[in-house]
């Protein structure tokens, strides 16, 4: 389970995240939606120990990310695939990560095949397309067979076949009792994939629940509801 309670972060005069509270239950996929600058990235960075919150807490399986003895065994994280080492091959990237996580090297090769990168495993990551880097980032997230996944824009750069593939993978993970937190700007894909939605605007949560709950009585579709909620709050977050 992923739990975020009263999480806040301020950068100078900017309240990037203000009192954010939500949870992601095992066996479900939670879609985390927000416009650029709404506070999604800052929230995910605090959840994964990359940014220290000013207030509040964020836990995965009851522990803060920084308290996990071997994070890769508990949570798979994919935030920014542009940060991958461009001079390493796909296989080198996976095997170094496997060594750090304490998992067999064979697991790295298994995931390269599962994500469709076996044929490109000996190529340097710097030659990969955006879609290939996304697949590699997902393979890294899955390396330790974690129960929870935190993924930021995992469908970026993927073609329709790739998007359908990742949707199936995430649904299978949730069906086996896993917890998925998925950040995306692709509303239609989130609608097709997620069980619950959390919408952030101006650093605050403005709506959360199932799609049916959020749309009940509004006469709107997801896009219309999202735009109406996010347009009420001006930008300024990260």
Where does each model-flagged region fall?
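Helix-to-loop junction immediately C-terminal to a conserved catalytic motif
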Residues: 48
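Catalytic Walker B motif of ABC-type/P-loop ATPase nucleotide-binding domains
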Residues: 149-153
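Conserved ABC ATPase "signature" region
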Residues: 95, 99, 105-120
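Conserved ABC transporter NBD signature motif
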Residues: 24, 56-71
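ABC ATPase "signature
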Residues: 208-209
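A short, surface-exposed alpha-helical micro-motif characterized by mixed small hydrophobic
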Residues: 190-192
